[in-house]
């Protein structure tokens, strides 16, 4: 067994994001009904790439590991930029997409859904996000 120190004074934490609403102001109203299922996904979006228009049926957050990502709300046209080291509180139910410019974006996404529930739902006529 390795010798371990139990010294909480040396542990560092930083709260990246705590919220009850998405980046665009839409409140999170409830978690999905059903047996809870947490999903963590890593996504890499190449430079000059746009994700298809889509929505999420459950609360989710992302952490940008590298690059920059712009999120665009379809209805309002409003955009929000996220840079490496920042967290994103994604919209639930609102149609949106993400896109990159000159550099790739690498992010980790955390979904709080229910068993059997899709993580992403494409706008009719759009391809699946993943």
Regions found by a protein language model. Give the residues of each.
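Glycine- and acidic-residue-biased ligand/ion/polar-headgroup-sensing regions
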Residues: 56-75
